[in-house]
Regions:
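Solvent-exposed, non-transmembrane regions of membrane-associated and secreted proteins
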Residues: 22-260
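N-terminal Sec-pathway targeting helices
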Residues: 2-19
Length: 260
C-alpha cells in the first residue's frame, strides 16, 4: 500500500498563519462597522438636539452670570422633524436616561424587520436600528420595540443589566418621543421568555379583564417585584432583545407602563 504524501510543515504553517490573520481581520472589520454605526447614531443625536437658531443659543450662553443662575434648566427637546424629513420610516426617538439606549425609532408595516440589519439611511449595518413591531401603531395597547443585544453594550446590549434589580432602581424610566411629544413609561416587569412567547401576541386590549390578565402574566414572569401594577387604560411599551446563547431563542423583555 502506498503511503499518503505528507503535507510539508511549511504549508501547514502558512495555512495557520493565514487563518489567524483572516480571523483578526474579520474581528477588526466587525469592530470598525460597529464604530461606524455608533458614529452615525451620535451624528443623528447631535442633529436633533442642535439649537434651531445658533445666534440665539450664543446669546443665551453669553448672558450675565446672575441672570443665567436665575433661569430654570430647560428640558432637552429634540427636533425630530429633521429626521422625519430624511427618512419617512422614522417615527420617533427611544431613550433610557443614563444608559446607552438613545436612538431613533423606525417603523415599517410591509417589511417589519427592514431595519434589523440596516442603518438609518438604508445601508447595511450589523447594528441595525431599533424598530417598532410592524403590527403595531403608536396607538397600540402594547408597543413592542426590537433592538440587537450587541456585545459592546450598544443598541439594546445594556438591557441585560436589568436582570439586576439595583440597575432597575437607577434606571426605571423609558422615554419615547414622537411627533405628538415626549411620553414617559415606568418599567414594571423584566422577563426572560422564548421568542414565541404569548406576550408577542399581546398588541390590543378588548376588555379590562383581558388587560389585567396580561399584567398578571407579566408580573408572574418578572425576575423581581418592582411594586408597580399598571391600571387599565395605561399604554404599555415593551423592549425586546436576544438573551442567552448566540443565535438561541431566548429573549429579554423590559415592560413599562405609560405614566405621562
Amino acid at each position: 500500500m502506498k503511503k499518503k504524501p505528507k503535507i510539508p510543515r511549511a504549508v501547514i504553517g502558512t495555512v495557520l498563519v493565514f487563518v489567524v490573520l483572516l480571523s483578526v481581520f474579520m474581528a477588526g472589520h466587525d469592530l470598525w462597522r460597529q464604530k461606524q454605526a455608533q458614529d452615525t447614531f451620535e451624528d443623528l443625536a447631535d442633529l436633533v438636539t442642535a439649537p434651531e437658531d445658533p445666534e440665539e443659543s450664543q446669546a443665551e450662553s453669553s448672558a450675565p452670570e446672575e441672570f443665567a443662575e436665575a433661569q430654570e434648566p430647560q428640558e432637552e427637546q429634540r427636533n425630530l422633524s429633521l429626521l422625519f424629513e430624511q427618512n419617512a420610516d422614522c417615527i420617533g426617538w427611544i431613550c433610557i436616561p443614563g444608559t446607552a439606549v438613545d436612538y431613533p425609532l423606525m417603523h415599517t408595516t410591509e417589511d417589519s424587520e427592514k431595519y434589523l440589519r440596516k442603518d438609518f439611511y438604508g445601508a447595511y449595518s450589523i447594528n441595525g436600528v431599533p424598530f417598532l413591531d410592524g403590527r403595531c401603531s403608536l396607538e397600540s395597547a402594547n408597543l413592542i420595540i426590537y433592538g440587537h443585544n450587541m456585545k459592546n453594550g450598544t443598541m439594546f446590549g445594556s438591557l441585560k443589566n436589568y436582570t439586576d434589580a439595583s440597575y432597575y432602581a437607577e434606571h426605571p424610566t423609558i422615554e419615547l418621543e414622537t411627533a405628538a411629544g415626549k411620553a414617559l413609561y415606568t418599567i414594571f416587569s423584566v422577563m426572560k421568555v422564548q421568542k414565541e412567547d404569548a406576550w408577542y401576541r399581546f398588541l390590543t386590549v378588548d376588555t379590562e379583564t383581558d388587560f389585567l390578565h396580561q399584567i398578571r402574566y407579566a408580573r408572574e414572569c418578572a425576575l423581581y417585584d418592582t411594586g408597580i401594577i399598571p391600571t387599565y387604560g395605561q399604554q404599555l411599551l415593551t423592549l425586546s432583545t436576544c438573551y442567552g446563547s448566540s443565535g438561541g431563542d431566548g429573549r429579554l423583555l423590559i415592560v413599562a407602563a405609560k405614566t405621562e
